Amino acid sequence: MVNMLVTVNISKGWNTWCQMAKGLEPRMNEVGSKILWAGCTADESAVYVLVEMNDPSFLKSFGEQQEIVAIREAGGADVSSTTPITEISNYFIS
């Protein structure tokens, strides 16, 4: 498994984005991926997400499917701004 830290600009605030992300969880799980952690900037204009996946290509193969793009956009995500920051090998959540 690979853990990637990703950022995305959002336009409808944290709560709307968070509801959308939680709604996508079952579909992500079907393809062996899940959100481990997510947080937003103080002005709620961007989110940072730690995603567990089988392969980094998941970001494109899943995140850019037309149906998934429509769901993400409805949740306020600027899909074109999706940016992988780095692979994360170790982390803890207290």
Region annotations inferred by a language model:
Residues 1-94:
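Short S/T/G/P-rich N-terminal loop/turn motif that feeds into the first structured element of a domain
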